[in-house]
Amino acid sequence: AMITVEGAISLDEISAPSNTADRGQLYTNADNHLHFINGAGTDVKVTEEVFIVALSDETTDLTIGNGKASFHMPFAMTLTAVKANCTTAPTGATIIVDINEAGSTILSTKLSIDASELTSSTAASAAVMSDTALANDALITFDIDQIGSSTAGKGLKVTLYGYRT
């Protein structure tokens, strides 16, 4: 089906729509962002931006170093979360990653993947963002500060979540 709109559409703010199995719903809530909830009840923030950045290939052991990946922000963005994952878990030590905007860290507690884990989601110390406002065209760089001591780890990726500002 296609909807053609001439003029404005307004949406009422609600905390969450009721789940309707046979249709999806668009709504806004207190975060002032557009959301979509599908018939199964999965809620997605439509305005969320997600960047996945590879800091290595899939088969080579990770190495410590600055500037493992970089890009310029295509627009200003407010970060809401950062995560990391790898395809081969580190052993013997934790993988630690720093994210920088224009050469300065944006993390007061760096992103980490604990030994024998594949994701930062289970890290004993969660990443803490100290700078969530990324400027348009800012240079974003990624450093690997620590790798596993027995098995370095492989296939490292960092995911940035946020919304345009």
Predicted features by range, described:
Residues 149-157:
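Extracellular carbohydrate recognition
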Residues 142-150:
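Short beta-strand-plus-loop segments that form exposed binding edges in beta-rich domains
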Residues 51, 65-101, 140-143, 157-163:
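Beta-rich globular "head" domains
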Residues 1-13, 32-63, 80, 100, ...:
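Glycine-rich, low-complexity segments
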Residues 15-19, 76, 129-133:
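Short, surface-exposed secondary-structure edge patches
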Residues 20-37, 83-84, 141:
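Short hydrophobic/aromatic-rich beta-strand motifs
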Residues 59, 68-71, 128-132:
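Beta-strand-rich interaction surfaces with strong enrichment in secreted/lumenal proteins
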Residues 88-136:
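Terminal beta-strand-rich extracellular "head" domains
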